[in-house]
Curated annotation (Swiss-Prot):
Organism in which the protein naturally occurs: Helicobacter pylori (strain ATCC 700392 / 26695) (Campylobacter pylori)
Any one GO MF annotation of this record: DNA-directed DNA polymerase activity
Enzyme class: transferase
Predominant location category: cytoplasm
Listed name of the protein: DNA polymerase III subunit alpha
Pfam families: DNA_pol3_alpha, DNA_pol3_finger, HHH_6, PHP
Complexes and interactors: DNA polymerase III contains a core (composed of alpha, epsilon and theta chains) that associates with a tau subunit. This core dimerizes to form the PolIII' complex. PolIII' associates with the gamma complex (composed of gamma, delta, delta', psi and chi chains) and with the beta chain to form the complete DNA polymerase III complex.
UniProt lineage: Bacteria, Pseudomonadati, Campylobacterota, Epsilonproteobacteria, Campylobacterales
Annotated localization: Cytoplasm
Catalyzed chemical reaction(s): DNA(n) + a 2'-deoxyribonucleoside 5'-triphosphate = DNA(n+1) + diphosphate
Length: 1211
């Protein structure tokens, strides 16, 4: 036996063979090094997802990485054929750069053209792209071994032909790869492997093909076998107890040492040596880029010459065309800038052009300019800017951004630092609805294979892995759920703690003692925990990055990254994740979908329809006091970035009065500034509570906009430049160092700063103190460029809410249409603004929320928002589109008319039911109860009508030749069942709309809740004095029960409705138990304390009382912040009432001998109690009765004037 000098693993699956390979790459690299091996290959199933991760990790450990994949190959000449279901495995390895690019191409085509259950290539494609590639016959699923293995019954059944066919196929591969095709032999102790073993050796002798010894490695250590089996079960949705599931018959698929392999293949030591031969042949060195030594190649703009010629210009290169467009763009921008400042702008522009040109980024800027230009030309809303790009005047001149960097003191160096080589990063916000159009434009512009979105890998993180493993081990759902809930809800939490940069980061095991108790007391929980520890952070599945796009204008992307086809989007995606794209010389562009831009666009369209005007945001008065009054009031629901409770409180405290204040609010509204005291300093100095002082007079122009407080990163840079004498480029490097908190770098820079200050004539000690202050606040400093750009959207939305609140709130509601809970929340806000929302109805509603004018009782036009049909839960877009298109020919006059006109191939029973429940079909002649009981009958009639109309069209009928054709008339045979009671109607409305329309659930308890005094209304909670007590009355709509992360005890979040809106209370274990003793179907009284957390007023629950107990309590008067408030009658928000709804018309029952005088009294009372419910008179005459509709609209309070009479809610 020859001495085994070396061995290389050439058949290895990492974590990128998703939920099949369980080799975590970094652990794998250390193990390979530990075993003394000098090289190792990766052969993931059908993909190259992990190639660069593998390459860099192995290089870091001093191991030679061999890049490969285990391809799936079929024998049809048509790559995309679905006729051939049979596929085989084949291992491929990149010898050199040519082989690497061929491998990336093959992997790309396998997904983009050959995918059928698996990513496949064929021999035709392989022949064309085999240069620089080594191949081996793979495992038992390889084509050669498949035909050899006639011992396997399944193989025989599906066409395994034996040795001769196997030899013929091996020779085909030999012809393709010549000396670079090897026969692979494995010895895992599997019977089928033993059967083919001697045949492979025989074939080697007959053909001259060399043999390599491999171990089909799926996990790192022998004891990882069971965990890998669990991972396979997760992938297949199986449990360990499922019979017939796919599993390995032996536990030999780990990283074996050279010694173990030598022992296994003692009879053919050359098979081990040949693995090293392959390793020696593979000389691939991937040219990986980095910012410091080997920067990425800046992209070029493919269309410079064509664009220039189209404009009658003669520019051949990106740089000259870019400079021209920037200068021309600035001329347009300067129209709004005072003339005395023009030189300043021109100088700044030339400086930026020079830096961008020297750094070779004109092509990048032109690519961004082009897609934003296209978006604006197509009417696709684009944000005013995002991130540090807003600090560039060039970006402003090119209309990439819409914020003037000089006006707001934004720094170009924050975007591009000439003293630090780094790629530019311009992120762009687009209308969420139309973002896809920009991606389609890029694909059309640069080519199908030159543009791709970016892959992401979802990992088995702490909570998720516990749930996955528990399911595989058949742990009961409740136990698994409780176990997972013990994992603390912290960002980046791990199951166990770990060391990082000399610091121990605690994990769930250290933070939650109950985990240890459970694991040590429960054997099944112990198994779940151990397997979870093994599988934690393993890649689970592939996804698509929400924003990133890569573009190569010169070559197809597969020259730099293999490509993948996303099942979710159908689009092309990189196989390499974000982290590895810049190293392979690709630059990403972020295309973000921003919902607020869609809201603004919808609002502007409604405004144009309603008012026949176009709002020009670029000419808004940025000092408009009415807009600032809206923000100061805290009434900021719907206003971009500042609508949360925390921001509402901050706005009230800070009372912004300038655009600079809005920029600051966005920067300050984060946990760091809130906790550091920055916010208090800012507010107190703005309002004169504290004096504004500057350590150096030179700081005043820098810190004046923020009242002497350091808020922005740009201010840090300017201070370092102005006081310490640094360049802005150096100042940016210091800013970055401060963020990293490197003590040595900070100390060195402090000395340099103090020395620089002295050289400029400043006091050294004062400079040292200033440095310490900068360091303190630098950690909380925000990017002003980003804050300023987003403040622009904040101002725009505040402007719309101030001047066009109906249109703006209608657009807001539309944006939330697919989330019923959000619609309900915004409806409450709309009501608080005293805007009426008309309920949905097929004769008045559009797809989206809309604005329309209705006549009030005085005959005046009154603007209202109309509920969109698209916001009704469960209806769907197709039936709504059909209903609205048909309605354009005239309103629906009856249910029969509706059925005869609507297409019932689109309107199904599932869609019709929520339309009925929501009240959208009221006034078509039948009650909701009747329609709901006859849904099948209605749908049958609709389908029969569709069929009859189809038969009557064209040449299919005697009637087809008649002009205009004919329509099948619908006749319904339905018995009137009357209407549901009020409670059922309200429940149906809440189910489909998320709100109550025809009344309030408390209406039925009017008598029980009479007489209570000093109760606080939900709309007044924020007006109460902090620390005071309050009693509120309401009905619990829902209690969401949860388990505390630390305590492990149950708690609940209760949604409670009163007559004026909703409020929320947290219920702890004791209160949850108390609730079980109470009837939650009835109103309850809640004793609370008013508290404030992070600027948000909250209720802390003390006690829950039923109405009987509450009557025995002397409820004290609530204490308001404004004493005058207690004297006011606070506005009530009434429930939304139905629009001319048969379910909410109000009728008074009278005898036929009623006197005219009494009728006059009714009319007077009706005018006093005007509302939205049609008033009917029901006149009784012996055994008959007649219903008369008046022209009066009333509210519920009219009943109080005629208590002795019978009243009916008409359906």
């Amino acid at each position: 036996m020859k001495e085994n000098k070396a061995f290389t693993h050439l058949h290895l699956h990492t974590e990128y063979s998703l939920l099949d390979g369980a080799n975590k790459i970094k652990i794998l690299a250390k193990r390979v090094k530990e075993l003394g091996m000098k090289s190792v290959s990766v052969t993931d199933h059908g993909n190259m997802f992990g190639a660069i991760d593998f390459y860099t990790s192995m290089k870091k450990e001093g191991i030679k990485p061999i890049i490969g994949m285990e391809a799936y190959i079929h024998n049809d000449d048509n790559l995309s054929s679905k006729e051939t279901k049979q596929r085989f495995h084949l291992c491929l390895f990149a010898k050199n750069q040519e082989g690497y690019e061929n491998l990336m191409f093959l992997s790309s085509m396998a997904y983009l053209e050959g995918f059928y259950y698996f990513p496949r290539i064929n021999k035709k494609l392989l022949k064309e792209h085999s240069k620089g590639i080594i191949a081996s016959s793979a495992c038992l699923q390889g084509e050669v071994n498949y035909h050899l293995n006639t011992n396997n019954e399944r193989n025989r059944k599906y066409g395994a032909k034996g040795y001769d066919e196997a030899k013929k196929i091996a020779c085909e591969y030999q012809e393709i790869f010549e000396d670079d095709f090897y026969l692979e032999i494995m010895r895992h102790g599997i019977l089928d492997q033993r059967f083919i073993d001697e045949q492979v050796i025989k074939m080697s002798l007959e053909t001259g093909l060399k043999i390599i010894a491999t171990n089909d490695t799926h996990y790192t250590m022998p004891n990882d076998a069971k965990a890998q089996e669990v991972a396979m079960c997760v992938a297949m949705g199986k449990t360990l107890n499922d019979k017939g599931r796919l599993k390995h018959s032996v536990h030999e698929f780990y990283i074996k040492s050279p010694e173990e392999m030598a022992k296994l293949f003692a009879d053919i030591p050359e098979a081990l040596e040949n693995t090293q031969e392959i390793a020696d042949k593979c000389v691939l060195e991937i040219d990986l880029k980095d910012d410091k030594k080997n920067p990425p190649t800046p992209p070029s703009f493919k269309f410079t010459k064509a664009y220039a010629q189209n404009e009658g210009l003669n520019f051949e290169d990106d740089a000259s065309y870019f400079a021209y467009k920037a200068r021309e763009g600035l001329k347009e921008r300067l129209v709004l800038v005072p003339k005395e400042k023009h030189d300043q702008y021109k100088e700044r522009l030339e400086k930026e052009i020079e830096v961008i040109t020297n750094m070779k980024f004109p092509g990048y800027m032109l690519i961004v300019w082009d897609f934003i230009r296209y978006a604006k030309e197509m009417g696709i809303p684009v944000g005013p800017g995002r991130g540090s790009a807003a600090g560039s005047l060039v970006a402003f001149a090119l209309k990439i951004t819409d914020i003037d960097p000089l006006k707001y003191d934004l720094l170009f160096e924050r975007f591009l630092n000439p003293e630090r080589i780094s790629m530019p990063d311009i992120d762009t916000d687009f209308c969420q609805r139309r973002r896809k159009e920009i991606i389609e434009y890029m694909i059309e512009k640069y080519g199908k294979y030159n543009v791709a979105q970016v892959i992401t890998f979802n990992k088995m993180l702490a909570k998720g892995v516990i749930r996955d493993v528990a399911r595989v081990l058949d742990m009961p759902y409740k136990e698994a759920d409780d176990f997972a809930k013990l994992i603390p809800n912290r960002l980046g939490i791990t199951l166990k703690g770990y060391e990082k940069n000399g610091e121990f980061i605690e994990g769930a095991w250290e933070l939650e003692p109950k985990i240890k108790e459970l694991v040590e007391s429960n054997e099944l929980a112990k198994q779940v925990w151990e397997y979870s520890l093994n599988l934690e952070n393993l890649n689970r599945n592939a996804g698509v990055h929400a924003a990133a796009l890569v573009v190569d204008s010169q070559k197809e992307l597969w020259h730099k990254t293999p490509l993948f086809a996303s099942e979710k989007t159908g689009g092309i995606v990189t196989q390499y994740s974000m982290k590895y794209l810049e190293p392979v010389d690709l630059i990403k562009f972020d295309f973000l979908g921003l919902k607020t831009l869609t809201v603004i666009d919808d609002a502007l369209k409604i405004i144009k329809t309603q008012h026949k005007i176009s709002v020009d945001f670029l000419s808004l008065d940025m000092d408009d006091p009415k807009v600032y009054k809206t923000i100061q009031s805290g009434d900021t629901v719907g206003i971009f970035q500042i609508e949360s409770g925390m921001f509402q409180g901050l706005n009230k405290r800070l009372r912004p009065s300038s655009f600079e204040d809005i920029i600051a609010i966005i920067a300050l509204g984060r946990p760091g500034p809130m906790e550091s005291g920055m916010v208090d300093d800012f507010v107190n100095r703005k309002h004169g509570v504290e004096p504004i002082a500057y350590a150096f007079k030179e700081l005043e122009p820098i810190l004046k906009p923020t009242y002497g407080t350091i808020v922005y990163q740009e201010q840090v840079m300017q201070i370092v430049q102005t006081i310490g004498g640094f360049s802005l480029g150096e100042a940016d490097l210091i800013r970055r160092a401060m963020g990293k908190k490197d003590a040595q770098i900070m100390a060195d820079n402090k000395a340099k700063f103090v020395e620089g200050a002295k050289n400029l004539g400043h006091d050294g000690q004062k400079a040292a103190n200033l440095w310490d202050l900068i360091v303190k606040f630098a950690g909380y400093g925000f990017n002003k460029s980003h804050s300023a750009a987003y403040a622009m959207i904040t101002f725009q939305t505040a402007y719309l809410k101030t001047y066009y609140k109906h249109e703006f709130m209608a657009a807001m509601l539309t944006s939330e249409s697919n989330k019923i809970e959000s619609v309900a929340r915004y409806i409450d806000e709309v009501r608080a603004l005293e805007i009426e929302v008309m309920p949905p109805h097929i004769n008045s509603s559009m797809q989206d929320f809309s604005v329309a004018e209705f006549k009030n009782q005085k005959g005046e036009l009154e603007k209202k928002i109309v509920f969109g049909l698209g916001a009704i839960k469960g209806v769907g877009g197709e039936p709504i589109k059909n209903i609205i298109e048909e309605r354009a020919k005239g309103d629906y006059k009856s249910l029969e008319d509706f059925i005869s006109r609507v297409d019932f191939s689109k309107l199904t029973k599932k869609s019709l039911e929520p339309l009925v429940k929501s009240g959208s079909l009221d006034n078509l002649g039948y009650t909701r109860k009747t329609m709901l009981a006859n849904l099948d009958l209605i749908c049958d009639a609709g389908r029969a009508k569709d069929k009859a109309n189809e038969m009557m069209q064209g040449g299919n009928s005697l009637f087809g030749a008649m002009e205009g054709g004919t329509k099948e008339q619908v006749v319904l045979d339905m018995i009137d069942l009357g209407e549901h009671d009020a409670k059922t109607l309200l429940e149906c409305e809440y189910e489909t709309l998320g709100i109550h329309v025809s009344g309030n659930p408390l209406d039925e308890f009017k008598e029980e809740i009479k007489g209570f005094k000093n109760l606080v209304k939900s709309i007044d909670i924020e007006e109460l004095e902090i620390g005071s007590q309050a009693y509120l009355l309401g009905k619990i709509m829902e209690v969401k029960k949860k388990i505390g992360k630390r305590s492990g005890k149950p708690y609940g979040i209760a949604d409670i409705l009163d007559r004026y809106g909703k409020f929320e209370l947290m219920l702890f274990e004791k209160q949850l138990n108390a609730l079980e003793e109470l009837d939650i179907n009835k109103p309850l009284v809640f004793k609370c304390k008013i508290e404030e957390q992070e600027e948000v007023v909250r209720l802390r629950l003390f006690e829950i009382l039923d109405l009987e107990s509450a009557r025995e309590v002397k409820i004290p008067k609530a204490r308001y912040k404004d004493p005058e408030k207690q004297k006011e009658e606070v506005r009530e928000i009434p429930p939304m009432e139905m629009l001319a709804s048969s379910s909410c018309s109000l009728a008074i029952v009278l005898e036929n001998d009623v006197k005219k005088e009494f009728l006059r009294q009714i009319k007077e009372s009706a005018l006093k109690h005007q509302g939205k419910r049609p008033l009917y008179l029901i006149i009784k005459d012996k055994d008959k009765q007649f219903k008369i509709q008046s022209d009066l609209m009333v509210n519920e309070k009219i009943k109080d004037d005629f208590k002795g009479l019978e009243w009916r809610d008409l359906a």
